[in-house]
Amino acid sequence: MTDLGLYLSRKSVNRSDVSRKTGISKTRLSELANNTKTKLRADELYLIALAIDVDPCEILKKVCKDLALKEE
């Protein structure tokens, strides 16, 4: 499961509702939640955040928590 999948699961998000509100297919949401090789686009993240009524930055911090700048 991806970080997005874990986040949505912890929030008890109904993916059918998210799909209906955002226009993102249930298949795509499933890929985003389960396949670590699938890349989440910024527009998808923003729409998902709007659909579940959270600040997009909250999701971004969870999904990108492992990213860091390279040390010089």
Give the residues covered by each predicted segment.
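Short basic helix-loop element that most often maps to the first helix and adjoining turn
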Residues: T2-K21
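Short, charged recognition helix plus adjacent turn
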Residues: L6-Y7, S12, E31-L32, L50, ...
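Residues in the helix-turn-helix
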Residues: D17, R28, E58
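Recognition helix of helix-turn-helix/homeodomain-like DNA-binding domains
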Residues: S25-T38
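Short, basic-rich loop-to-helix N-cap that marks the start of a DNA-contacting helix
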Residues: T36-L50
